[in-house]
Amino acid sequence: MRMISVFLGLVLLTGFSGSVCADPPSDSKESQIEITIKLKIKIETKGKGDAKDKAAIKKAKPKTRLYAERLRPQFHFTARQWTISKLNPAIKGENTHGGEEGWLNDPNGLVYYKGEWHLFANGAGSYWVHAVSKDLVHWEELPPKLHRDDKLGNTASGSAAVDWNNTSGFGTDKEHALLAFFTGWKNKVQCMAYSIDRGRTWTKYANNPIVAHPNRDPKVFWYEPQSKWIMIIYGPPKRSYIFFGSKDLRKWEKLSTFPDMFECPDMFQLPLDGDSKRTKWVLSDGNGSYVIGQFDGTRFHTEQEKEALDYGFNFYATQTWSDVPKEDGRCIQMAWMRGGKYPDMPFNQQLTFPCVLSLRTVRDEMRLCRYPVREIAQLYAKEHKWENVTASSGNDLLRDIKGDLFDIEIEFDPAQSDALGFKIHGHDVQYTTKAEHVVSRRTHQMKVKRKNGLIQMRLLVDRTSIEVFVNHGEISGANCILPKENGPPPRLYVNGGDAIIKSLKVRELKSIWPKAGRK
């Protein structure tokens, strides 16, 4: 016997003991966020406790609604739990990394197919969390996929792609095969799985592994100029990427190595300054750091040395979506906001908000920039606007604004001010005029230069995070926070002399979660 918790629809009911058939079968039917689970409840009563126990069950009332927990991010993706015995956050030991449901880390298998953005992520150390979206904003989490097995062990990080040419032979007349590539953690070998029902069910390839070379994190994509697949994995040799090539996804040839890279490889092509005749390849590693150059189908040739992408303390395991339609044309990235704290919550860790990547010339160098996807506008509930106003010490323009979810955009001339900043959830995001840098909580100093005398900043503020983008994404910083309960409303402040605000927009945001207790 053990304490269990039960969801009635989306309502969490707690406070009685029972035995549970916990794990859903692999072919279980899915609804938006519900799963059918059979429960066998046995109530033990002893002595004078009979009446109290029965009364407690009769009077069981909803506690915390799923997705409305106090520290649940409201527009950043987090995982839910599927094992019924772990739905109660009060059970000690369930909410630390090492096998609990509700955990996620590296985003994996980001792929677009037939109108759906698929998001996978490492979950509970042994499978992939799975969610789909029509708009990159609202997510429906489906039951976990690619569970561990005795042969391969836990399912570690990887990638996904659509097999448009059916080189695998897994496709059908009606459906192209979705392919997932992952590390089988038992021997740290590279494996493949496929789906022919739009990612709802997956079959692991019978002759796994497809690449016996250790270590991990296979990134696989189709290289059109030579009609072959490219796989990039992390090490060995230590702190290196290894490139492989294949025509049929079964026989792989080692092509080359690339040094000074660590974990979670990703590689994609972008036009420089929007010029399709000047495309570059970008090779990025675990923390988003990247090199820019050319790829000839065998080797990556560096044209510019490694640069940092994000200056925050909670940004890791970056991945971009594969198979984005040509008519869309965007390169879209997510990352794990590693290290966030969510005490007493039935989930752990969150992902960044999806961002578009672009390659721009900044101060005579090529710079990878990231900026929130335009679909965030679907969440705007109310907008407050100011134009051409003077901001001075003691004059807080935001004094009448309430809430905890915001998309804030400001363009300003520092003028005579020493600093201009926002205090949100008790944390500062500040531009310092003399030093010409932006700091957000623990963020490394983000050195920025004015454009036509102006600084542009954008802040995405969720319950447990602040993402900062400066000069339309030339510099960014992702940080997790712990908000103060019943903390002060957001505030704009200026130190020293006046600053001139050319434009300020504060958009209050709606939750992305169904029935999350918000309008």
Residue ranges of model-derived segments:
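Bacterial N-terminal signal peptides
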Residues: 7-15
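Beta-rich accessory regions
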Residues: 61, 70, 74, 296-316, ...
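Structural motif
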Residues: 127-129, 188-191, 239-242, 289-293
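Conserved Ser/Thr-centered positions that define the repeating blades of beta-propeller domains
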Residues: 133, 193-196, 243-246, 294
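Surface loop/turn signatures of beta-propeller and other carbohydrate-active proteins
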Residues: 53-109, 121, 137-172, 199-222, ...
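Short, low-complexity, charged amphipathic interaction modules
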Residues: 27-51
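Entry beta-strands of beta-propeller and related beta-repeat scaffolds
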Residues: 116-119, 168-180, 227-231, 276-281, ...
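Carboxylate/His-rich catalytic cores and anion/metal-binding grooves
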Residues: 157, 175-204
